[in-house]
């Protein structure tokens, strides 16, 4: 449908209405893979929260690769830093193909299709094959949140209830009883297909 895309397939600009294109400043002839999203508890038990990439993106402007399999070898580079613009955008979950209420902040790369270096990646992009993207990252600010009555975990319990309602799949966090709140992280050199 219009306005929806899979984060692993990237964004097909030709299928979006003009208002969506304008809100992202998107251009035809570019590939827009979603590398990461916020407000979701993953299998690692961490939850990224909006604006966690702000400092890193400013510090690394023009220095982030798009690669295959987190490999920075010359034969794995999909796009070099000079051709990768990295930004965040708050979007509805449906926009990234998920059936949750509310929104997420997506970490998105903008890459000219004619600058894609790796033939295997070109095929994945052209065929719109569903393949996972991810970011090589380093935590900067991470906090332990726990739904516990233990006297030594008072602050952790407060964190749990301060953040739980922002998590799209909060039932998973409630069942587990804890999660890691990530409020700042660094992109370490690359995002990967």
Where are these regions (language model features)?
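Signature of dsDNA virion morphogenesis modules
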Residues: 1-193
